[in-house]
């Protein structure tokens, strides 16, 4: 786990088994990490959105050599730096909730179908996987197909659970799924 220096003690106490890599900055993500030793990388939850972090994020995305999952603050940074979206690697996974998708697409959708079509178009244009979170989460594939998860419940689409979902997807990618 890469985290600002200030988080070291709390991380040691709450998740002692986590391997930590501390950012040189006290309170923000400022430098990309070497991803060579990793099988997957999840970026976004708790990241923050200041300009130093935004620059470090795009540098991290460019330098990453492993599969990436982008969520939360990382999605918001990409939404405010739209030109950077063209630099995303093929097959990246983006996990927006509906409002984050609206920001990514640069439009506002009032209906679910319209939003779903925007997610599908964006996935095709970026050659990315977009998991649009909701009661029935939709996975928009780079080839234009859309798969729905109609099993389970909307627990992972509930406010505050996106960080957990990012971790689960990242862990599955790291295991080779």
Model-identified regions with their sequence ranges:
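Glycine-rich phosphate/dinucleotide-binding loop and adjoining beta-alpha-beta core of small-molecule
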Residues: 2-151
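Short, small-residue alpha-helix embedded
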Residues: 103, 155-177
């Amino acid at each position: 786990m890469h985290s600002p220096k200030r988080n070291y003690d709390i991380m040691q106490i709450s998740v002692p088994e986590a391997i930590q890599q501390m950012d040189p900055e006290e309170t923000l993500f400022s430098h990309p990490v070497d991803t060579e030793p990793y099988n997957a990388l999840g970026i976004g939850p708790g990241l923050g959105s200041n300009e130093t972090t935004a620059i470090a994020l795009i540098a991290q995305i460019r330098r990453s050599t492993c599969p990436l999952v982008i969520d939360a603050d990382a999605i918001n940074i990409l939404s405010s730096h739209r030109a950077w979206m063209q630099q995303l690697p093929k097959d990246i996974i983006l996990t927006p909730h509906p409002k984050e998708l609206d920001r990514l697409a640069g439009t506002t959708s009032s209906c679910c179908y319209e939003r779903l079509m925007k997610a599908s178009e964006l996935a095709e244009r970026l050659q990315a996987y977009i998991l649009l979170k909701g009661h029935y989460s939709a996975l928009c594939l780079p080839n234009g197909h859309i798969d729905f998860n109609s099993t389970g419940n909307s627990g992972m689409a509930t406010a505050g659970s996106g960080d957990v979902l990012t971790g689960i997807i990242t862990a599955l990618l790291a295991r080779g799924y």
